A protein has these predicted regions:
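Short helix/loop segment flanking the catalytic signature motif in cyclic-nucleotide metabolism enzymes
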Residues: 80-84, 112-128
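Catalytic core regions of nucleotide second-messenger enzymes
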Residues: 103-104, 133-147
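Hydrophobic scaffolding residues in well-structured cytosolic catalytic/regulatory domains
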Residues: 33, 51-52, 58, 110
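Catalytic-core segments of nucleotide cyclases and related cyclic-nucleotide turnover enzymes
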Residues: 120-127, 153-183, 188
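Conserved nucleotide-binding and Mg2+-coordinating catalytic segments in signaling enzymes
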Residues: 34-53, 74-80, 86
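A short pre-motif secondary-structure segment
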Residues: 94, 101-104
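Short glycine- and acidic-residue-rich catalytic loops of nucleotidyl-transferase/cyclase enzymes
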Residues: 103-109, 113
Length: 188
């Protein structure tokens, strides 16, 4: 009887092993796809989708606990190459706390979410970011420069789009200053 059952047992074990391998491969593939869906390939920072999700969650948290939060947009403002975009992302990541989030929104545009952060605390963080960005150089050796616009939300906005609109307004003010690197801040 064992002789007749042994091939069936071996086949069953092989099938279970094959299924286990397939499930593990599928899990690895899903984890990779989740990462690709939320991270920017070039820089390794979060992408716009991940920012929208995190900002939406922060709006809800701010509404529930009545805490302020801050957001800053960074625009490198010139046509820059991949190396400078990667360096800017690294400088931004290096100047943030573990609870903060940096995301790349466009070619040379980044946005930083500072949960439970007041305007004075956000300005301290932004000064660190600005210092890190000030060290970046273009190919010809000139400073890269950046415009930074931020908003502290004392009352949570209704939607993420309001965050984007408010930071875009601050960026426009920073660019209008005409300086190489300028920060504007507002409380909403």
């Amino acid at each position: 009887m064992l002789r007749t059952c042994l091939p069936i047992i071996v086949l069953a074990l092989a099938a279970v092993g094959g299924l286990t391998w397939a499930v593990m491969a599928l899990r690895r593939s899903l984890a990779r796809e989740r990462r690709l869906a939320r991270y920017d390939d070039l820089t390794g920072v979060r992408n716009a989708r991940a920012f929208h999700e995190a900002a939406g969650a922060e709006i809800e948290r701010a509404r529930r606990y009545q805490h302020p939060f801050s957001v800053a947009a960074i625009d490198l403002g010139i046509r820059v190459g991949d190396d400078l975009v990667r360096a800017a992302a690294a400088a931004l990541r290096g100047g943030l706390r573990a609870t903060d989030l940096v995301a790349r929104l466009g070619r040379d545009e980044f946005i930083v979410l500072l949960p439970e952060t007041t305007a004075p605390a956000a300005r301290i963080v932004l000064d660190k970011l600005r210092a890190g960005l000030a060290e970046l150089r273009l190919i010809d050796g000139r400073p890269a420069g950046a415009s930074i616009g931020g908003v502290t939300f004392l009352n949570p906005p209704r939607a993420v789009e309001e965050i984007i609109r408010a930071t875009d307004e601050r960026i426009a003010e920073a660019k209008a200053s005409g300086t190489l690197s300028h920060v504007t801040w507002n409380e909403a």
